[in-house]
Amino acid sequence: MNPILTNRLQKKLGYTFQQHDLLLQALTHRSASSKHNERLEFLGDSILSYVIANALYQRFPRVDEGDMSRMRATLVRGNTLAEMAREFELGECLRLGPGELKSGGFRRESILADTVEALIGGVFLDSDIRTVEKLILDWYRSRLDEISPGDKQKDPKTRLQEYLQGRHLPLPTYQVVQVRGEAHDQEFTIHCQVSGLAQPVVGNGSSRRKAEQAAAEQALKLLELE
């Protein structure tokens, strides 16, 4: 691993690892090594959920559980994490196997998002819960400042369905058109047919549900609702 890249990444993250092997493991996809980042990802996912839930609870004392759940889902969903990964220029530091490199895995949203969670898990093991909580809140400062309760936090499929129902239009249809990769690391491609759009909208994700949500989000953008 190029030390120039990892040093630059740590500056962007705002954290320097004491145990460098944890950083390397967090950046390692299962296609590259048996010592990959999935256990760190599991840990980081839980820590991220706790930190964001606690931040929302403190910021919005009058907001009900449903709205807080929707806001948390918006903040921790895959495309938000992938967007953050691109801000960190994380793709250049990923350790991928030859197949993933060839297929552009360093750009794949699911891999980028999973790696952010793995880094959170790695930082926790390298330090403590207070340190990783402060770091996550630093990463999320602008997003937490911008987010607010309300319909905007409903997931894209729900918002698309409500939009169409409100206009007495047929509900969207979702069709799996491609599944790539092995069982542990698949990428689904979905076509979403929406009344009012001439062509099916395409969505990709690491599960059918995520791909459908991605397609619905694209449809909302085309309908100028996003």
UniProtKB/Swiss-Prot annotation:
Catalytic activity: Endonucleolytic cleavage to 5'-phosphomonoester
Residue stretches making up the RNase III domain: 6-128
Obligatory cofactor(s): Mg(2+)
Gene3D superfamilies hit by this protein: 3.30.160.20, Ribonuclease III domain
Residues annotated as signal peptide: none
Residue positions binding Mg(2+): E41, D114, E117
Gene Ontology CC: one annotated term: cytoplasm
EC number: 3.1.26.3
First-level EC class: hydrolase
Active site: D45, E117
Entry keywords, A to Z: Cytoplasm, Endonuclease, Hydrolase, Magnesium, Metal-binding, mRNA processing, Nuclease, RNA-binding, rRNA processing, rRNA-binding, tRNA processing
Cell compartment(s), UniProt: Cytoplasm
Residues of the DRBM domain: 155-225
GO biological process terms held by the UniProt record: mRNA processing; regulation of gene expression; rRNA processing; tRNA processing
Molecular function terms from GO: double-stranded RNA binding; metal ion binding; ribonuclease III activity; rRNA binding
CDD domains assigned to the protein according to its UniProt record, in alphabetical order: DSRM_RNAse_III_family, RIBOc
Main subcellular location of this protein, as a coarse class: cytoplasm
InterPro entries: dsRBD_dom (IPR014720), RNase_III (IPR011907), RNase_III_dom (IPR000999), RNase_III_sf (IPR036389)
Purpose of the protein: Digests double-stranded RNA. Involved in the processing of primary rRNA transcript to yield the immediate precursors to the large and small rRNAs (23S and 16S). Processes some mRNAs, and tRNAs when they are encoded in the rRNA operon. Processes pre-crRNA and tracrRNA of type II CRISPR loci if present in the organism.
HAMAP family reported in the protein's UniProt record: RNase_III (MF_00104)
Annotated PANTHER family: RIBONUCLEASE 3, RIBONUCLEASE III
Listed name of the protein: Ribonuclease 3
Gene name linked to the record: rnc
